[in-house]
Amino acid sequence: MSDLVLRLARPGEDARIADFINQNFDMRLPLINRADFYQFYYAHTPGAAPQFALAEQDGEILCAAGYILANQSETPDIWVSVWVAAKGHNGVGLELMDALSGLLNARVVACNNIRANTCVLYHFLGWQAERLPHYYRLGAPGAKGWQLAVPGSNSAPLPVQDDLPLTRVPDAAALAELGLPHSSHTPHKDLWYLQRRYFAYPHQSYDVWAVQEAGALLAYAITRTITAAETGCVPVVRLVDFIGDDAVLPRIGGALDKLLHDAGAEYLDCYNAGIP
């Protein structure tokens, strides 16, 4: 038996990797099996290698990890979005995950949407892994009352600051002209990522908002409105991304409330590691 080889995928290995994942995962993942998603996330550069790292022994794949680039730096930040090991080879999966930063020369390796029962594996690797809180900002009920939200007894809206407006960014060119605000968040998302993710995504559409003060760009807030037709009853607004310093976020509370009101939404929600 030969030594275990940990390496990046090569051009033309797409079908082999997809077959391995489909054979060893308990569901057919849309990111792998829908061509539009696969090309957007893993194969967006024609002729290049798909964005996967592999653990291989005697020519057989034992683990595959698909990654998403957050920026185009020579030392990029990445997300691991698919991590599948062959049955009986979980240890190999841990070895591959531990080797990813070196294989990619990555500054930050992150992972979201992990299963709760895998947190212990990330802890073993020295990562921080935990459940993200889910935050809500209530709007107002319609004539039929609350249809999606179930407000508790202590759900009166908290007061918010209202000193910074939101200005819509109409397209990717306008985003490039504005540039990037300072942000300490990781993974670091550059303009290439933001333009692709929020102006060229194959399915959902997003609203990108600039937060400015005295001519200076402080942040971007990205929202998505889920329509009444999509929910079956009332609209919902989601704050899906925030690029900027944490101290700016509370200052757009009034502007977010206006978005909520203008959309006729019952609530605005977001997942976040912590809102100051």
Regions found by a protein language model. Name each.
Residues 1:
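Nucleotide-sugar donor-binding/catalytic module of glycosyltransferases
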Residues 4-83, 167-244:
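A conserved beta-strand-loop-helix scaffold within acyl/acetyltransferase catalytic domains
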Residues 43-47, 106, 126, 147-149:
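Alpha-helix boundary/capping detector
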Residues 68-141, 231-276:
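Acyl-donor binding region in acyl/amide transferases
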Residues 137-159:
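C-terminal "cap" of GNAT-fold acetyltransferases
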Residues 160-165:
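A conserved mid-domain beta-alpha-beta active-site/ligand-binding segment of alpha/beta enzyme cores
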